[in-house]
Amino acid sequence: TLGGLPLIIWALRALEEIDDITEMVPVFKSEEMAEGLDLIGRYGITKVKQVVPGGKERQDSVYNGLSSLDTKTDIVVIHDGVRPLVEKSLIKEAIRQIDDADGVIAAVPVKDTIKTVRAENIVQETLDRKSLWAVQTPQVFKYPLLTEAYRKAVSERFYSTDDSAIMERYG
């Protein structure tokens, strides 16, 4: 919890306040579905139309959520419920920019020094952090393109920790 509220409620409230978001489909672990529904009702989150059980990996959970949406959906905003302090202005700006792109991601420049390491834990290379960004959520995509990219990833058993990486590969 944060300030007495569950983290997921902070995230859902931020999304709920965005006029361009008309429907939300939270994805919960199967064993947390009842608790999730209870929280949504208790805290008056009205844009949730359904909740969906997650999968083994994050990618499976996102795919389950995407698969539950109406095929007439235009865009999707993917946000991790463990990022409770998302700024509404960031969500709005990402949605605004999707008209000119297939996807829009939130990211911050890397401040740490990043190294690649061989299997024996021996440093192989130091990467130039000027060209590195840490990707976060929200991530906004055109629904048909992201859904097709996810279908291809599933069929090829390609796994990534990030939705934009799936779009890079298949979108």
Question: Model-derived features: where do they sit?
Answer:
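Hydrophobic C-terminal alpha-helix "anchor/cap" residues
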Residues: L12-E16, I40, L69
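N-terminal glycine-rich phosphate-binding loop and ensuing alpha1 helix
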Residues: T1-A34
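Conserved core of the sugar-phosphate nucleotidyltransferase
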Residues: L85-Y170
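Short, high-confidence coil segments that cap the C-terminus of an alpha-helix
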Residues: I21, I45, T73-D74, D100-G103
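Structural beta-sheet core signal
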Residues: V25-P26, I78, G103-A106
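Residue-level signal for inorganic ion chemistry
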Residues: I8, G65, H79-D80, P109, ...
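Short active-site oxyanion
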Residues: I21-V25, K49, D102, K152-V154
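Short phosphate-binding loop-to-helix
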Residues: G41-I75
